[in-house]
Each structure stands twice: as structure tokens, then as C-alpha cells.
Regions:
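Active-site-proximal cap/lid insertion segments
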Residues: 3-8, 15-196
Length: 196
């Protein structure tokens, strides 16, 4: 994050694919190619960013498989703007309808610190973004297995903060935890950490 002096290459990384000035996709709504990112060549029209970043990571691992390596993969998912693949968005819209989990009165709790907090987790686009990221993680894990590196490579999966949960159009609910991104409550600072 930040100007060029803060980019990965300036911090000791040898290769940078897609790392740029912000935590979301470069130039706003760029989860699909053309990305318009000076650190990532455009792929075929409509190529999905999480899949592309996973494939770039596997290529890096293939190139460096004979020596110790560090691959640091930061998916822009599920950062705003919220844009999912059409097939996944439709899948989760149907699931929400099946569960009868449409937005209803009471979806937001009473105002807390002049904001209302989302209490219902039923955002189809957000769910689609999560699944696409999960598939991309699977691509990297499959690449490690194919290259015979899965038993000799530590993989860490983590996030940087809790989800946005306030009523300004953001999709997540961190309940039963209090708060979300930007709050010092557990909903803002508790995050996943998986080590394999």
C-alpha cells in the first residue's frame, strides 16, 4: 500500500505480480481483465483476478522449486468493490432464496456509535467472492502437490481484519462478535489463521 517506494520490490521481494498502491483492485472495479494494473499484464477479456493471481503464484513456485522460496499471495478478495463471477453470484442468490434469507426488517441492529450493524449474512456477491478465493487457494495447493512440494512447504492463510459490518452497504456480519473493520472490538480484530 502506498506510493512506489512502499511496493513489494522496494521491500525486498524479487517478483511482484499485481501489488500496487491500494488494498482493492487497481483502478476500482477491476476484478476482471482488462485489469489496467501496471504490475499485472492484462489476461484474456473476462479473466478473473483471483484465478489469475493463483496461476501467477504457481508459475513462480514452478520457477523457484529447486531452492527455498517465499510466495506471498494477497488476494484482493473480498475487498470492495464487491464483484463476483456471474455463475457464483447466481448460485448464492438461489441459495439465499431457498433459505428464505432475503433482507428483512430487523436485518440491522439498533444504532451503535451512530451506525447500525448488519445482523444477517446473506450477501450473494460476497459469498461468490469467498468461493472464488477458495478455488484460487485450491489452485495453489494443487500446484504444490503436482510439483511434489506439498510436504515440504508451509502454507499460511490469514486475513488482515474483520469484515465491514456497518450499514453503509457492506455485506458482512461478524456476529456474535461485536464491531467490524475499523473497530477495536473483537469483530474488527479477530481473523482466520490456518497453517498447513
Amino acid at each position: 500500500l502506498g506510493p512506489e517506494g512502499f511496493w513489494p520490490e522496494s521491500q525486498g521481494f524479487d517478483v511482484n505480480r499485481g501489488g500496487i498502491t491500494r488494498g482493492g483492485p487497481y483502478g476500482g472495479k477491476k476484478y476482471f481483465s482488462p485489469y489496467g494494473n501496471p504490475r499485472l499484464k492484462d489476461g484474456p477479456p473476462g479473466e478473473h483476478l483471483p484465478a489469475r493471481l493463483a496461476n501467477e503464484t504457481v508459475k513462480f513456485i514452478e520457477t523457484n522449486r529447486e531452492k527455498p522460496f517465499l510466495a506471498y499471495l494477497s488476494f484482493y478478495s473480498v475487498h470492495t468493490p464487491l464483484i463476483a463471477r456471474k455463475d457464483l453470484r447466481q448460485k448464492y442468490l438461489a441459495k439465499r432464496k431457498q433459505l428464505d434469507a432475503a433482507a428483512v426488517a430487523g436485518e440491522f441492529s439498533k444504532r451503535e456509535h451512530r451506525r447500525r450493524v448488519r445482523t444477517l449474512q446473506a450477501h450473494a456477491v460476497y459469498a461468490g467472492m469467498i468461493e472464488a478465493m477458495d478455488q484460487a487457494v485450491g489452485t495453489v495447493l494443487s500446484g504444490l502437490k503436482r510439483l511434489g512440494l506439498e510436504k515440504n512447504t508451509a502454507v499460511f492463510f490469514m486475513s488482515d481484519n474483520g469484515g465491514l459490518s456497518t450499514s453503509e452497504g457492506h455485506p458482512t456480519s461478524n456476529l456474535p462478535l461485536r464491531g467490524g473493520k475499523g473497530w477495536m472490538y473483537e469483530g474488527g480484530i479477530r481473523e482466520p489463521l490456518i497453517v498447513r
